[in-house]
């Protein structure tokens, strides 16, 4: 296994943002998204309902916009912090994600991932086997429902992007900045959506916007889930926790087909991203070329990732994720 700390030092050469390339990546994502979205709306309004079949494609472009917003949050899109922030806020209007709220939560996720004593910041709620057994029957049922794929990939993304992001949940007492971020994003999104509503009506706009957003949201949650929820994941108590170990061993390499790799902005190379989050998304493949040992480390294909949704609990004794059925056998 590569030494995580040495890798962090080696990866510094990939960290410098490339503004020209970044703006190009934004252009070839935002312009097609807007054009495709407008085309679907016009076609659907004209009665060509088959145009709605294109909403998943629009959703993929929206997902890529979120990845670019994600780079802004890490300061890896442009060289200037303020420029990163304002581009991130602009993109948040399209992704329905208040940038300042999300970027703080996501920074905490990076700082605390894999730490059993600091769970709950921008991650998928995960109990240990012992904690699950200590819960009441009602609490265990609630956790089972939460971990069900229908919740994680269906209700969860819808709740997160349609409802939770409308307010600075978790940050309500941390300053006006986060209220302005959430409410300002809401108003700006409504202002943009007012244009198609005025042109073709609320019904057609909703019929295009909702599936586009929900497809992108579900894809995003799928990516986020498999990035840290896999059999040999990394979880340690605070006294034994290591940032570098958590980054390298607690994150996967989701090896996707080239088209999906493009739409997901290479974020599947997640172990590298957690080791050095300021590497621009378009440079992550360069790291794999320079460090071939990272290719097969925690590597999963899209198909293999689906089995990870059976995992539900962290077993501290075996140091691995287990299913509810496996936990039941262990505890009797």
Task: Briefly describe each language-model feature range.
Residues 221-233:
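Transmembrane-cytosolic junction motif
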Residues 1-16:
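Short, Lys/Arg-rich, polar N-terminal cytosolic tail immediately upstream
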Residues 15-18, 267:
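Short, histidine-centered active-site or binding-site loop motifs used for metal coordination
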